[in-house]
């Protein structure tokens, strides 16, 4: 019997916390146009309002000066623009910023990573995570629910507003978004896809599809479905050169093994233009677990039929974790083996680890409503794609 991952409580509500009003951040452009049509307005009004919402991070209808007063008044009666609030901010010595963002009575974490030529925002898709990857802090928090569209795109909106207001400090505007925060995005397709549509929309944030990246641990039915819904860059959390190791550290592999996963990746690449023909492989380096030169040779053989570049990620510790970080010398030897096979191989620079904002360290504040035994069934049995 298959398990349903998306529950009734986690599907996208049309109505916000204020039961009388629709949160416009929950609507992509098609839905926004339908909303205005139902108000008796022309569809172009949706474009106007979205431009104010996303180009100027405006949440006040009275400031939308190219909208007539009558319509502004009507909008105030039936709608609102409500992004989740930042309740805590931490700044790293390397410029990385981590925001704890309130979603109801819980928190998720969003990370802003500035670089010389760009700024990347790492966005969460769920409150917690059900997949229990052993090396990841988020997985140890359990799982509560999927984020709504407004809570996903609202992270980008809130970050853009903060960075935009701080232009005098020299902070770089957001150029890239990665769905690599808390949660497994493919277990929340219903809400993740509309949020990414807004990121790509010219009346939304207007990002290139090559600058919006979704990372997955391998929910194969949902990955096949994603390719028919939207085209964005794809990264996969592989982390092991064989099924024996991956079964242990990424338990969903017991249901969708590496061969099955990579087959779905290749099918996605056939449909995608955003990836320019290759996928990004994420590989966390765990000391004497998956980081030997024999593992590097196995990985190279495993990936020879999958066009890719490989990101080696030094593991970032968290309390109670059973692993150690690979030494620089082991990472260097591993990298050289991969490059000898002709793979583009990058050792990811750790950012924000002094504020627990680095890869695998995001935890938030999660009320775990998914029992551990249920989570194990979710990993060991078929996932109902109709529920995704």
UniProtKB/Swiss-Prot annotation:
Q: Which SUPFAM superfamilies match?
A: Radical SAM enzymes
Q: Which UniProt keywords apply?
A: 4Fe-4S, Cytoplasm, Disulfide bond, Iron, Iron-sulfur, Metal-binding, Methyltransferase, rRNA processing, S-adenosyl-L-methionine, Transferase, tRNA processing
What is the UniProt remark on how the cofactor binds and its stoichiometry? Binds 1 [4Fe-4S] cluster. The cluster is coordinated with 3 cysteines and an exchangeable S-adenosyl-L-methionine.
EC no. given is: 2.1.1.192
| Record keyword Disulfide bond present | yes
Q: Give me the Gene Ontology terms describing cellular component.
A: cytoplasm
Q: Does the keyword Iron-sulfur apply?
A: yes
Q: What is its main location?
A: cytoplasm
Q: What class of enzyme is it?
A: transferase
A single Pfam family, by name? RlmN_N
The Radical SAM core domain covers which part of the protein? 115-354
Required co-factors: [4Fe-4S] cluster
Query: Could you give a GO molecular-function term held by this entry?
Result: tRNA (adenine(37)-C2)-methyltransferase activity
What this protein is reported to do is described as: Specifically methylates position 2 of adenine 2503 in 23S rRNA and position 2 of adenine 37 in tRNAs. m2A2503 modification seems to play a crucial role in the proofreading step occurring at the peptidyl transferase center and thus would serve to optimize ribosomal fidelity.
For this chain, the family text in UniProt reads:
Belongs to the radical SAM superfamily. RlmN family.
Protein name, as recorded: Dual-specificity RNA methyltransferase RlmN
Which classification does the entry list for the species? Bacteria, Pseudomonadati, Pseudomonadota, Gammaproteobacteria, Enterobacterales
